[in-house]
């Protein structure tokens, strides 16, 4: 009987020891302690080469940060935004509208932004007029008492399309926010913007459909050049892109380059920021990721990722206020913009 009790004690002690060792082993060698972050990214079924596969970006970030970075496949900005909102992903590159909505409505933040071809992370939105117009003369007379923007009331406006950033949302946000134009209709209905344009400018305002003659940046500038309108809303580089003085391939409808006058910029349209969820990405993790992204330009492989996967010459560190503040401060005045963006970026 005593022998049985002794053997039972040994067996129990052995079992406890095994359990303790197993638990200790789990604490020392378990992968559960390794932080996993997911970046929402549009993926395809196959790629011509691995250089185009976003998995290469995830692998690079994992190696550079020591974190486990995984892809979360999405097919649209709306799905990326929803993934960030509900915790399925921690980071995503978003367009300006989706990023601003995520910042304002869901508390997302920005850690980086991609550069455009000229190295900037934005482009400026302008009203372009002709130098012999009232607005053009007011812009060139060096007289602070004259207001070129006030001269545009009642003139036919040339927009790049319905609800385009530089061609409509930014300039109309400026005119409404600065008190030049009054909203006509329900302030919670995006369609009121159309009536506001017709009321402040002209019922003949050009708001073209995709594919029509005056659609896009070139279309808005052509609308101005051919006398169909008195002001074209476009970006800072539009005139030189199509009507540069020394360009042999300038468009046939272009006027002399010095005929075009840009009024002071309304504001900036942002490039794509890398937005993140502050609830899951702390400051130290953000710093690791930003450092890795900024270092992409230092190696040939990194430059390949920038060119073939991110489609940008480089990235900069930023935050939501710096990158989206100018844009959001303008478009918030557009009637119905919040509801429109809610619907546009709601998960399908």
PLM regions: where:
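Secretory targeting signatures
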Residues: 1-33
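Periplasmic-binding protein-like
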Residues: 38, 42-43, 112-126, 185-207, ...
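An extracytoplasmic/periplasmic, membrane-proximal ligand-sensing/linker region
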Residues: 34-37, 45-59, 281-348
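A ligand-binding cleft/hinge motif common to bilobed small-molecule-binding domains
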Residues: 93-107, 174-177, 217-257
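Short, well-ordered beta-strand elements
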Residues: 33-50, 67-73, 155-158
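Ligand-binding cleft/hinge of the Venus flytrap
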Residues: 57-65, 153, 165-213, 245-250
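Short helix-initiation/N-cap motifs at beta->coil->alpha
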Residues: 71-82, 95-97, 183-222, 226
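A conserved helix-loop-strand patch within extracytoplasmic ligand-binding domains
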Residues: 114-183
